[in-house]
Amino acid sequence: MGRLGPSNGLLPLLLAVGGFSLVQAQRECSCSAVSPGILAGIVLGDLVLTLLIALAVYSLGRLVPRTRGAVDVTRKQHIAETESAYQELQGQRSDVYSDLNTQRQYYK
């Protein structure tokens, strides 16, 4: 198989946009080259660490009890037992709407 590396045209193009030539970039850099094995190890280590963090958050999230939802359910049951949410009908009451008839005359 072929050697892994950047494409022949992409790296000089990116360096030209940045104002460097390929020769200048290699001369000015006093760092060692990173082998593909080291790079793959860094990427795989990052993936494993990310998965471990996600699993830890998930497992700790399942351990925490959901008290808020349980309190709401018991509170709703308590209200339902003590009083009705609806007012009982008491027949026809004209005194409730009698004020509306007097106010209607002012708007005509």
UniProtKB/Swiss-Prot annotation:
Protein name from the UniProt record: TYRO protein tyrosine kinase-binding protein
Assembly: Homodimer; disulfide-linked. Homotrimer; disulfide-linked. Homotetramer; disulfide-linked. Homotrimers and homotetramers form when low levels of partner receptors are available and is competitive with assembly with interacting receptors. They may represent alternative oligomerization states or may be intermediates in the receptor assembly process. Binding of a metal cation aids in homooligomerization through coordination of the metal ion by the subunits of the oligomer. Interacts with TREM1. Interacts with TREM2. Interacts with CLECSF5. Interacts with CD300LB and CD300C2.
Site, as annotated: Important for interaction with transmembrane receptors: 50
Residues the entry annotates as binding Ca(2+): 46
Residues on Extracellular side: 26-36
Transmembrane domains' residue ranges: 37-57
Modified residues (Phosphotyrosine): 86, 97
Tissues expressing this chain: Highly expressed in spleen, liver and thymus. Weakly expressed in lymph nodes. Expressed in peripheral blood leukocytes, granulocytes, macrophages, and monocytes. LPS does not increase expression in granulocytes.
GO cellular component, one term: cell surface
Keyword Electron transport: no
Classification via InterPro entries: Tyrobp
Location(s) in or outside the cell: Cell membrane
Keywords on record: Calcium, Cell membrane, Disulfide bond, Immunity, Membrane, Metal-binding, Phosphoprotein, Signal, Transmembrane, Transmembrane helix
Membrane topology term: Single-pass type I membrane protein
Signal peptide: 1-25
Main localization category: membrane
Domain ITAM: residue ranges: 75-103
UniProt GO molecular function: metal ion binding; protein homodimerization activity; protein-macromolecule adaptor activity; signaling receptor binding
Gene3D superfamilies the record matches: YojJ-like (1.10.287.770)
Family: Belongs to the TYROBP family.
Function noted in UniProt: Adapter protein which non-covalently associates with activating receptors found on the surface of a variety of immune cells to mediate signaling and cell activation following ligand binding by the receptors. TYROBP is tyrosine-phosphorylated in the ITAM domain following ligand binding by the associated receptors which leads to activation of additional tyrosine kinases and subsequent cell activation. Also has an inhibitory role in some cells. Non-covalently associates with activating receptors of the CD300 family to mediate cell activation.
GO biological process, one term: negative regulation of type I interferon production
Post-translational modification, as annotated: Following ligand binding by associated receptors, tyrosine phosphorylated in the ITAM domain which leads to activation of additional tyrosine kinases and subsequent cell activation.
Cytoplasmic topological domain residue ranges: 58-108
Gene that encodes it: TYROBP
